[in-house]
């Protein structure tokens, strides 16, 4: 039993230095205990709600370790942004390919249109002759 108490005192001293819930409500950690609300021991921490022997005992409501997993998850989340960058890099390349294909298609259509204007030339002349008649209509308007 003496060894366990000595270990607790040692642990508490180290935690006090790190600022992990100093003292709390009870003597040996209390509510803050070994990590307080989000540290190494979750809500109850190392000493439970009241301390060394209180309601939570040496494990409290969440025990030692659950809080420690949280920081690990945060580290993994950092890997997300680099992954997001890769799709961004790929997108412009795809866009470029699309752009290259479109102008060629447009060129083809333009070529076809060039053949039509020659045929349209005759039609345009006919329209010019009709315009002469239109001048007459203009006089009628007067």
From Swiss-Prot:
UniProt lists compositionally biased (Gly residues) regions at 65-77
Gene Ontology cellular-component terms listed: extracellular region
Keyword Signal part of the UniProt annotation: yes
Compositionally biased spans, kind Basic and acidic residues: 112-124
The residues forming a coiled coil are: none
Disordered: annotated segments: 65-142
Where in or outside the cell is it found?
Answer: Secreted
Job description of the protein: Likely to be involved in the establishment of the head.
The entry's protein name is Protein spalt-accessory
């Amino acid at each position: 039993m003496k060894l366990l108490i000595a270990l607790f005192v040692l642990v508490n001293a180290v935690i006090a230095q790190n600022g992990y819930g100093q003292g709390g409500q009870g003597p040996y950690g209390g509510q803050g205990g070994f990590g307080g609300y989000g540290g190494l021991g979750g809500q109850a921490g190392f000493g439970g709600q009241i301390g060394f022997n209180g309601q939570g005992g040496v494990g409290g409501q969440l025990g030692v370790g659950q809080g420690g997993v949280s920081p690990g998850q945060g580290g993994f989340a950092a890997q997300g942004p680099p992954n997001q960058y890769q799709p961004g890099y790929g997108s412009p390349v795809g866009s470029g390919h699309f752009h290259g294909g479109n102008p060629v298609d447009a060129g083809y259509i333009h070529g076809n249109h060039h053949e039509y204007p020659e045929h349209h030339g005759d039609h345009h002349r006919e329209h010019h002759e009709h315009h002469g008649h239109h001048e007459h209509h203009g006089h009628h308007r007067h």
